[in-house]
From Swiss-Prot:
Residues 2-472 form the UvrD-like helicase ATP-binding domain. Its cofactor is Mg(2+). Heterodimer of AddA and AddB/RexB. It holds the Pfam family UvrD_C. Its EC number is 3.1.-.-, 5.6.2.4. It catalyses: Couples ATP hydrolysis with the unwinding of duplex DNA by translocating in the 3'-5' direction; ATP + H2O = ADP + phosphate + H(+). This is ATP-dependent helicase/nuclease subunit A. One of its GO terms (biological process) is double-strand break repair via homologous recombination.
Length: 1207
């Protein structure tokens, strides 16, 4: 039985009111949540009466697993109600323990009619495909509106015309869409965006000024006023040497006081503007070298304060007082018109986007939440029924990671909540709210955090879980030391020093373990902070050196599985970075040192070597007149042209494009010209192939023709490379399944993904990466823990691009820049919007830092390559106030993590040691070791065990490996000849006999091979009755399938209807009229009126017919004794039909095979055996790509007029 703290037990046992659990990192929140659910179930609340909401599928699955494990343990106890507990255990998998999206989807499936939705909708799971449809909608809106000079859209587009940055009007509309879709009433939200611009010729009296700008100005200048007063009250300033300094500051504060009073008293705008212009430092004075040292130091501090004050005055004036009131009013009025036009354009985009999705019967993720909210909130009888259904169903609603909820999700939960019938249990940590880019609103958590804290509040309760059971004491001390100075009530919304600190609870760590956190710094020679948005590679050198040391000294860690102390493994180490932009370079550095590295969230998919090769091949298949892609393909191991070869080709044709140069070289007549001819022939074949086949088939054909999969598998990290290539095929197939076509459009789609920095994550290996160091982004590490954590990127510049563009979007406003004839000017909404956005971004960056540092269990190592370190240490020493806090102004001026960390780390108060002395220093008592890495430090790297070498951008290194591997491949006696003697593309019609025929599968594989290099089935003998007509059995079967494909289940079902539908197919030239006399209409009539087809008539919208699919199937599942266990074959086919029932998918296939009536059972069994494999393929394809799963497979035997189930 776990021992819970008093607060944990309270969170488990408390009932009868809403509860917010604020659970700090490592405090066991998931354990508490599971234990609470278990207690609910034991006390009689069925698992089906609980709604448990998480924010990821993985978290939902983990939650289910933990609950099942807990119930299983409970079942083993004596005296329990085993029947009841078994029932609950069996219900866990189908219970409402899911993501918010999955719950919304259930609401829609159950009450789709409330919003007039076709129940056979398909989920558009690929966000990038949704983005393509959205872009299509946007282009249609533009085409319809931009030609009209009087249109509102044209008016607002003109305001952004000529922008050179990314902030175009199209970007604005697409960004605004994401904000709108997270709002419960997005239409009214969009329409109200223009209202904030109303000033009514009195800016100071406007709601914008009174509600937002006034408080910001007062907070800023009162803070500055207090800081100056502290200096004026310091005795040092009374010395005669500083008399002029005192006079200067005194005159400044007198004017500042008048300005502050004017703000407080709401004096008119122009008066405030004039008073602010008087806030200057005008007294002249100079520092003397003769002054005492303490006076010189104080003088330096006053000059820094003076510079800060001047900067604040300038920033405030340019943002809020740049023009007089008359001009400012005009700017606001013009901006209001533009924002009104933007809102109308956005609504038009949303409506068109929805229309295009509905035409294809698609729903995307934003639809799920919006439609679910509409169903639950509308003032209709259907919505009331939906609300009451869920309010009565659930006795408690439990929400995990509540800090990540947005306004729409919160409102959905509130619709299910009923004070008289159920309660809310919310668990989260606002310090870990790091998903602002997904419109998460931590303010929702904070509102409850403060509101639930009151002892007078009897209906709502707050519980704090502060004990950290993950980390050693030095790690918790380091985290607390940092965040006491960063997070406060006015920055982050929580007073960390009083309520947010971690309490060391992991007292199970042996005392003898080395625990101290480390800060390893290198003094960079030149400050290039402004240009450095990534990792400095001396940081990687420091990490490599420290890992080397840790391995060499057999650093001891506590194994969480065995409870025993053991030597450090590579897999115990995680390297955390803010972004993934440097992953490939870091992989290269680790590869050079033979230290295994595994990238767990490598969102650089299209930058990997193998994807670069195949994407360039696709580009030249689409258009060969592209020199860079063409040369890349020629130089690749697919064709192995050397640099010398390419030079000869270019010299022969100096002025043409490279494709023309290759074609021209064919006439030279040497060995290279033969290779050029071979390349051009293959390219021509693929270009022709591309015009008649799907993109996915083209990709697989390239793999088969070039052995690209085998080549890449032979390289280091080859299995990951192979999976990457297979995933491209899957993505192309998904792209086409969504209705998109064309190689050119597919390439553009991929390019757009890369440009928008939405590169795809590499599909991870199903197995873990073994003994390798993990490299991941901080966002990717959330929820994980590691014995040793390296944090890189202390100098990584925060991305504040949103503030520099021509618009800024916040939860309650859209601020724009107004374009004038010769200049641009920010509206007041944009000015205060910049302030709000910057604060939100910096608060989130502080939380990101918190998440990173709390991943460490035993050792936290901060790594930084810092320019001007000694100067920075001096500045940091004076930035904290007496309570150890950074001022709000200092926090809001931070530009990188070091700006938060530097002052709190107090470098000046600690002894700095060298890298070589770390081991000896680990016995010291301090919780943090300050380590300097010098360029003279030299660490030899030797090869170690379990190497995993990553990608490299070193062309020679990569190319040598590739060419070597390619030569081995072609000189090798290939053991899997059966794979090489078949194309990787197979039609179901060709493999269905080989799949399941008990006689044929016993033959040698070569019996099934033909000159076309496919596994071919023997041609079936035609049934005797078919010889009586001039049409073959296949032709009649095809015609029958066609009629059943288009049969209308909303008609009257009569013979006249059937005749009418046949006539329509003939008119549409889909059916040959001569075949009609040969059709067996009685078979068709039998089937459409059979009991099997009854559901088709009731819910025809749930019926899908003639569904094309392509799927990768393991060759060993298709062909017995296939030699390569890992080989896959592309299978393409068409499913006759399936019906989506409430329980799942019912799959069926029509068969017109002749049935011998004299031996009916035997004939049916033979047909069943013949086609079982085919239906299993169909089932596998549907289960692999669809949301619902197949629950039944049936053969429709038209000749026998029977429906036969296939197991």
């Amino acid at each position: 039985m776990p021992q819970f703290t008093k607060e944990q037990q309270q969170a488990i046992d408390d009932r009868g009111h809403d509860i917010l659990v604020s659970a700090s990192a490592g405090s066991g929140k998931t354990t508490v949540l599971v234990e609470r659910v278990l207690k609910e179930i034991i006390s009689g609340t069925q698992v089906s009466e609980l709604l448990v909401v998480t924010f990821t599928k993985a978290a939902a699955e983990e939650m289910k697993t933990r609950i099942k494990t807990a119930l299983t343990k409970e079942l083993a106890k004596p005296g329990v109600n085993r029947k009841y507990l078994r029932e609950q255990l069996n219900q866990v998998d189908t219970a409402n323990i899911s993501t918010i999206d999955a719950f919304c989807l259930e609401v829609i499936r159950r009450f789709y009619y409330s919003v007039n939705l076709n129940p056979s909708f398909k989920i558009l799971t690929d966000e990038t495909q949704a983005a393509l449809i959205k872009e299509r909608a946007l282009r249609e809106i533009e085409a319809e509106s931009l030609t009209d000079e009087n249109s509102g859209i044209r008016y607002f587009y003109d305001n952004f015309a000529g922008d050179r940055d990314a902030n175009s009007p199209r970007d604005l509309l697409l960004d605004l869409y994401n904000f709108a879709m997270a709002k419960p009433e997005y239409r009214s939200w969009l329409k109200n965006l223009a209202k904030i611009y109303e000033v009514n010729n009195n800016i100071v009296k406007s709601k914008l000024w009174q509600n937002q700008i006034k408080s910001y100005l007062l907070n800023t200048f009162v803070s500055l006023q207090k800081k100056i007063e502290e200096y004026l009250n310091n005795p040092t300033i009374e010395t005669k040497e500083l008399a002029k300094v005192k006079e200067d500051f005194s005159l400044f504060t007198q004017n500042l006081d008048k300005f502050i009073d004017a703000i407080k008293n709401d004096e008119d705008y122009d008066q405030q503007r004039n008073l602010l212009r008087l806030c200057k430092f005008e007294v002249k004075y100079r520092k003397s070298a003769k002054w005492d040292e303490d006076i010189q130091e104080f003088y330096a501090e006053t000059q820094k304060l003076k510079s800060e004050a001047k900067s604040q005055i300038f920033d405030i004036f340019t943002a809020f007082y740049a023009t007089d009131e008359k001009e400012q009013t005009r700017i606001m009025q013009e901006s209001q018109k533009i924002v009104s036009a933007i809102s109308k354009a956005e609504l038009a985009l949303i409506d068109r986007f929805n229309e295009l999705k509905r035409n294809e019967n698609f729903l995307d993720y934003s639809d799920m939440e919006q439609l679910a909210y509409q169903i639950l909130s509308a003032d209709t009888s259907n919505s009331q029924m939906a609300r009451e259904f869920y309010q009565n169903k659930f006795k408690e609603i439990l929400i995990d990671e509540y800090q990540d909820i947005n306004a729409l999700q919160e409102r959905i939960i509130q619709q299910v909540k009923n004070t008289d019938k159920n309660t809310l249990f919310m668990v989260g940590d606002v310090k870990q709210s790091i998903y602002g880019f997904r419109q998460a609103e931590p303010s929702l958590f904070l509102k409850k955090y403060h509101g639930f804290a009151s002892e007078e509040n009897k209906h709502e309760k707050r519980i704090l879980l502060s004990d950290n059971f993950r980390s050693t004491e030095p790690v918790t001390k380091t985290v607390n030391q940092l965040f006491k100075s960063i997070l406060s009530s006015d920055f982050g919304g929580i007073d960390y020093s009083k309520e947010g600190q971690l309490i060391f609870g992991a007292k199970y760590y042996p005392d003898a373990l080395p625990k101290a956190s480390e800060i390893i710094v290198h003094k960079k020679q030149k400050d290039i902070d402004n240009d450095n948005n990534g990792i400095d590679f001396s940081e990687v050198e420091m990490v490599l050196a420290r890992i080397k040391q840790l391995k060499k000294e057999h650093f001891q860690v506590l194994d969480s599985t065995t409870g025993e102390v053991r030597a450090l493994k590579y897999s115990d180490i995680a390297i955390l970075t803010r972004s993934h932009g440097d992953n490939l370079e870091i992989m290269q550095e680790f590869a050079k040192r033979d230290i295994p590295l595994f990238i767990t969230d490598a969102e650089n998919y299209f930058q990997t070597f193998e994807l670069t090769v195949i994407m360039n091949y696709l580009k030249i298949i689409d258009n060969p007149d592209q020199d860079i892609p063409l040369v890349t393909v020629l130089r690749s191991p697919l064709f192995n042209f050397s640099e010398k070869d390419l030079a000869k080709i270019r010299i022969n044709s100096k002025n043409s494009g490279f494709y023309s140069a290759v074609a021209s070289y064919v006439g030279i007549g040497d060995e290279l010209s033969d290779r050029c001819k071979n390349f051009l022939n293959k390219l021509d074949e693929l270009r022709k192939f591309a015009t008649t086949h799907r993109i996915s088939e083209l990709i697989w054909s390239i793999y088969a023709q070039t052995n690209l999969l085998e080549i890449m598998t032979g390289l280091p990290n080859g299995e990951q490379r192979r999976i990457n290539l297979e995933a491209l095929y899957e993505r192309a197939s998904s792209y086409e399944s969504a209705g998109f076509k064309g190689l050119y459009q597919f390439i553009n789609f991929i390019n757009r993904m890369r440009r928008s920095q939405k590169d795809l994550a590499q599909p991870l290996l199903s197995k873990e990466a073994g003994n390798a160091v993990r490299l991941m982004t901080i966002h990717g590490s959330k929820g994980l823990e590691f014995p040793v954590v390296f944090y890189l990127g202390m100098q990584h510049q925060y991305q504040l691009r949103d503030l520099k563009g021509n618009y800024v979007i916040n939860p309650d406003s859209l601020g724009i820049t107004l374009r004038q004839e010769h200049y641009r000017v920010d509206s007041l909404v944009k000015a205060i919007g910049n302030v709000t956005k910057k604060r939100q971004l910096l608060e989130e960056e502080a939380r990101v830092l918190y998440v990173a540092l709390t991943r460490a269990k035993q050792k936290l190592i901060l790594v930084g390559d810092i320019a001007n370190l000694d100067k920075k240490v001096q500045d940091w020493s004076i930035e904290l106030d007496q309570s150890g806090q950074l001022s709000l102004a200092d926090k809001l001026s931070v530009t990188n993590p070091l700006g938060f960390m530097g002052p709190a780390l107090a470098f000046d108060k600690h002894i700095v040691i060298n890298m070589n002395d770390i081991s000896n220093a680990l016995d010291q008592s301090q919780s943090v070791l300050y380590v300097e890495y010098k360029d003279s430090d030299n660490f030899e790297f030797k090869k170690d065990e379990d190497k995993v070498v990553g990608d490299s951008k070193n062309n020679n290194y990569t190319m040598d490996k590739l060419i070597s591997t390619t030569k081995k491949l072609y000189q090798f006696d290939y053991p899997f000849k059966d794979a090489s003697e078949t194309t990787a593309y197979q039609a179901v019609s060709e493999i269905k006999k080989a799949f399941n025929d008990p006689i044929e599968t016993e033959l040698e594989n070569s019996r099934l091979l033909s000159s076309t290099n496919r596994y071919l089935q023997p041609i079936d003998t035609k049934p005797n009755f078919l010889y009586q007509t001039k049409f073959t059995g296949a032709e009649i079967g095809t015609a029958t399938h066609l009629i059943l494909q288009y049969y209308d289940y909303t008609g009257d079902g009569s013979e006249k209807q059937l005749d009418y539908e046949i006539e329509e197919l003939i008119k549409q030239k889909k059916l040959n009229p001569d075949i009609v006399p040969s059709l067996h209409k009685d078979q068709i009539q039998w089937f459409v009126h059979s009991s099997f087809a009854k559901s088709f008539w009731k819910n025809p919208e749930n019926l899908q017919r003639e569904v094309d699919f392509s799927s990768l199937i393991s060759a060993k599942n298709l062909f017995k004794d296939f030699s390569d266990a890992n080989a896959k074959i592309l299978v393409h086919g068409t499913i006759d039909g399936y019906f989506v029932s409430n329980d799942g998918i019912i799959l069926f296939d029509y068969k017109t095979d002749h049935v011998n009536k004299s031996y009916l059972d035997k004939s049916i069994n033979l047909i069943k055996e013949k086609y079982t494999g085919q239906l299993r393929l169909y089932e596998q394809a549907i289960n692999e790509f669809g949301e619902e799963k197949v629950i039944g497979k049936y053969l429709i035997l038209l000749d026998a007029k029977q429906v036969v189930e296939v197991k």
